[in-house]
Structure formats: C-alpha cells, structure tokens
Amino acid sequence: MNALLSNPFKERLRKGEVQIGLWLSSTTSYMAEIAATSGYDWLLIDGEHAPNTIQDLYHQLQAVAPYASQPVIRPVEASKSLIKQVLDIGAQTLLIPMVDTADQARQVVSATRYPPYGERGVGASVARAARWGRIENYMAHVNDSLCLLVQVESKTALDNLDEILGVEGIDGVFIGPADLSASLGYPDNAGHPEVQRIIETSIRRIRAAGKAAGFLAVAPDMAQQCLAWGANFVAVGVDTMLYSDALDQRLAMFKSGKNGPRVKGSY
C-alpha cells in the first residue's frame, strides 16, 4: 500500500490495541494542532454537535497532519454527499452518528466505497485524499485504509446491535452515552445503574463480534471502567470542557466566592 494511504488508527484497532483519544469541539485548526502535540492516540473532530463547516474540518485535518495523533471525523449525519466530501478532503476514519439498523450501516458502507463496491462519487483528481491525482491507483487501494465506525445510541440500535455488527465494512461501534441514556428513559444520567449495565454488555458484545468498541467518558473513573470492560478506543475528555474547567480553576484561585470546576458526568 502507498504510505500516504496507511491508517495507523485502523491498524491498531485490528491488533486490539487500546487507543486513548480527545474530543475536539472548538472548531479551530489552532486548537486542533495544540491537541495533536499532546500525544493523544486519536482526535475526534466533531461535525455533529460542534459548528464545523466542511472548510473547518479540512483546516483541522491539515493542522494535525504532521503529528502522530490520528484524526477521526464525525459528520453531522450519514448523508452520502457529505460522506463523499469528508473523504475527499482526506479523512480516513469516520464516526457516523445515529446508526440504528443494519440497513443504515450498509448504506454508510456503500457511501464510502467506489463502484462497483459502493456509491462514492469519483473525483480523486481534484481531492486532497488522492493528493490531487498524485497517488497512483488510489481508487484500487483506498478501501484498505478507510476505517468506518458507527454510533449506537438508541434503544432501537441496541435491539439491532448484532445485525449491525454483522455488516461487512464496519470496523467498530461507538456507544453514545448521552443519547443512549436519554433513549432509555434516563436523560442526562449515563451513570444510572441500568444504563451502565447496558453499556457494559454492549461493549462486551461488540468485542466478542471481533469489532472495536469505543466510548466517550469525560469522568476519568468512567473511562477506566469502559477500558476494563474491553473498550479499545476511548475518548477521555472534550477540549472545550477542559478549557472551561481550566479557566474556572484559575479564576477561583484569585477571586473569592468563585466556584471551582464544574462537576460533569456526561457529554
């Protein structure tokens, strides 16, 4: 494979290695580059809940490219045209939100593959992903470097988890704790014992199926628990939350009556 098409994040998942990540919601290439120099294994650049345009995502991919931290792009939705754009700007690993059924998972796989294996539009000659046509035989080899992760974050998705896990082309499944807990009837309470039980069993089912299991845990003890359950790509913080906490802590050192860091149990 051409070295430009290698995907260390995917290779480590295949080996079952644990990878520790950070969620990026700040939407700036400057903050993304700072995060990339910190040594996290992967960085989730969020296009779902953060106000990132396709240009913002592009600039953040450029910013982290010189560093070892591997970027993961989460588009706002699983639209075929948006997935095409995100892949063309050079994303190799995608996290697709709100995948509830095996049919939806198959549609996502198809959107990432060129014909005859899928429906991805052909435009390698004008795409950063193919270095504007300079990567020889890009279309023939790109599938090997693509890593596709889907989010299971509803009761419907849990009911269909085994079928989703059976879809060829899905490399991993990410448990979305905030939406999942709300769907189960425990909004803003991912720490509820029933939610925790379901998270544990889901992670174990994902790993038993030979797929990578992912999670976002802003509380360190929850991150450690998910790792103990077998999750092997875990984000342990969100840049905007860490930044706001650091600001609060510093101000509290100098102004009486100011609160310390906020207690945050979920994203």
From Swiss-Prot:
Which residues does the UniProt site feature Increases basicity of active site His point to? D88
Enzyme Commission no: 4.1.2.53
Signal peptide bounds: none
Which keywords accompany this UniProt record? Lyase, Magnesium, Metal-binding
* A GO term from the CC aspect: cytoplasm
Instruction: Tell me which residues bind substrate.
Output: Q151, A178, D179
User: Whom does it interact with, and what assembly results?
Assistant: Homohexamer.
- Function summary: Catalyzes the reversible retro-aldol cleavage of 2-keto-3-deoxy-L-rhamnonate (KDR) to pyruvate and lactaldehyde.
Q: Could you tell me which HAMAP family the record lists for this protein?
A: KDR_aldolase
| UniProt xrefs under PANTHER family | 2-KETO-3-DEOXY-L-RHAMNONATE ALDOLASE
Q: Under what name is this protein listed?
A: 2-keto-3-deoxy-L-rhamnonate aldolase
Q: Which organism is it from?
A: Escherichia coli (strain SMS-3-5 / SECEC)
Question: Gene name?
Answer: rhmA
